[in-house]
UniProtKB/Swiss-Prot annotation:
Biased amino acid composition, Basic residues: 170-179
Record gene name: rpl15e
GO biological process: cytoplasmic translation
SUPFAM superfamilies assigned: Ribosomal proteins S24e, L23 and L15e
A single Gene Ontology CC term: cytosolic large ribosomal subunit
Family matches, as PANTHER family: LARGE RIBOSOMAL SUBUNIT PROTEIN EL15 (PTHR11847:SF4), RIBOSOMAL PROTEIN L15 (PTHR11847)
Organism ancestry: Archaea, Methanobacteriati, Methanobacteriota, Methanomada group, Methanobacteria
Keyword annotations: Ribonucleoprotein, Ribosomal protein
Protein name from the UniProt record: Large ribosomal subunit protein eL15
Coiled coil: none
HAMAP family, per the entry: Ribosomal_eL15 (MF_00256)
Record flagged with keyword Ribosomal protein: yes
Gene3D superfamilies: Ribosomal protein l15e
Pfam family, one: Ribosomal_L15e
Organism encoding this protein: Methanosphaera stadtmanae (strain ATCC 43021 / DSM 3091 / JCM 11832 / MCB-3)
Length: 186
């Protein structure tokens, strides 16, 4: 019971990080994170409450990786050929994929033997966004014998980050909304 109360307060603190202890905590951690590699495997999640809500368990077979991704909309090169600057189509163009989905795909490429379960936002500064990605090892016996997660071991869940089967992928493909009115989302 005590853990659930703790998670409740952690959730509230992360909802408004500027008004809670989270801002000071990140001010200490961010200089270290900037010097570390872009993708780094970490021992335990920074936001344990969020990770557990998304399916993380502290046992063998589960891995958490933190990734740094650039901020902002799509980087599009300027045309060399002549045209009206208005028709160049350089500014205000966003990509099809969200930055979170890009983060999941990059981590999946780094760890090809693991499957992406889910991911969540951790922090952002002027240049980058930081996400933590929860990965699962489908070959691990503790995962294969756990009825709550062994669905990820089947072949139809291979490379799920690249096929948009994670939560961020489904959101970007417009699959969160159903029924009347959702026609233009997809």
């Amino acid at each position: 019971m005590r853990c659930y109360i703790m998670y409740k307060y952690m959730k509230e603190a992360w909802k408004n990080p500027d008004e809670s202890y989270v801002k000071e905590l990140m001010r200490e951690r961010l200089p270290k994170w900037r010097r570390q590699p872009v993708i780094i495997r970490i021992d335990k999640p920074t936001r344990i409450d969020r990770a557990r809500r998304l399916g993380y368990k502290a046992k063998t077979g589960y891995v958490v990786a933190r990734i740094r991704v650039r901020r902002g909309s799509r980087r599009k090169s300027r045309f060399k050929n002549g045209r009206d600057p208005k028709r160049m189509g350089v500014n205000k163009i966003s990509g099809e994929k969200s930055i979170q989905r890009m983060a999941e795909e990059r981590v999946a490429r780094k760890y090809p033997n693991l499957e992406v379960l889910n991911s969540y936002w951790v922090w952002e500064d002027g240049k980058a966004k930081y996400y933590e990605v929860i990965l699962v090892d489908p070959q691990c016996p503790s995962i294969q014998h756990d009825n709550k997660i062994n669905w990820i071991c089947s072949k139809k869940h291979t490379r799920r980050a690249f096929r948009g089967l994670t939560s961020a992928g489904k959101k970007g493909r417009g699959l969160n909304k159903k029924g009347k009115g959702a026609e233009k989302v997809r």
